[in-house]
């Protein structure tokens, strides 16, 4: 279908609402992030064009630099960050505008996806690349996807984290730990998968 006919979900489902709030390093309610998001969204424009403007702004205004993760607020204030910071800023700007979005983790890299619906309410997770090739609406990435979210509850540390911890610690008794990775593929590129 026509990308320009896609729209922001009017009533996001419960499973989508988690992709509208803050997460570690994705400071959706920060005043500067909210003001920038408001300035980038044009009420008369279609959703695809609005998200494309967010994509262009992040790519054009935040310089890539390999560094430890500092988050969306840091990337906006300092205009510098690595793929995780740039992704966090894109995600925060989308979420602040009411557009569900999430971080996709692959080996050695992260990129954002945003969620739009067609006229019949069918939703699509759409990839974008904010650090690296300027892909928008497609992803020619060969590395396997490790995770598609940026707000998980760590049961050991009892707090929210950006991604699944790959380590654990135990005290007293014999530890029993199982970590599994399952490789999933979309049946159709852009199909909703959560």
Go through each PLM region and give its residues:
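Membrane-proximal bilayer-interacting regions
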Residues: 108, 192-193
């Amino acid at each position: 279908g026509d990308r320009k006919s896609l729209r922001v979900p009017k009533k996001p489902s419960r499973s989508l609402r988690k992709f509208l709030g803050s997460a570690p390093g994705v400071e959706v309610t920060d005043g500067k992030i909210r003001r920038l998001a408001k300035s980038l969204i044009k009420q008369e424009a279609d959703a695809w064009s609005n998200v494309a403007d967010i994509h262009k702004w992040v790519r054009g205004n935040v310089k890539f630099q390999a560094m430890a993760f500092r988050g969306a607020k840091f990337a906006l204030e300092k205009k510098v960050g690595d793929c995780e910071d740039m992704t966090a800023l894109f995600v925060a700007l989308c979420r602040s505008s009411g557009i569900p979005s999430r971080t996709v983790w692959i080996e050695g890299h992260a990129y954002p996806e945003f969620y739009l619906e067609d006229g019949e309410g069918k939703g699509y997770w759409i990839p974008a690349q904010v650090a690296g090739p300027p892909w928008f609406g497609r992803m020619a990435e060969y590395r396997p996807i490790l995770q598609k979210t940026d707000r998980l509850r760590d049961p050991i540390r009892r707090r929210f984290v950006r991604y699944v911890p790959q380590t654990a610690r135990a005290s007293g008794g014999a530890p029993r730990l199982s970590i599994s990775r399952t490789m999933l593929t979309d049946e159709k590129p852009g199909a909703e998968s959560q």
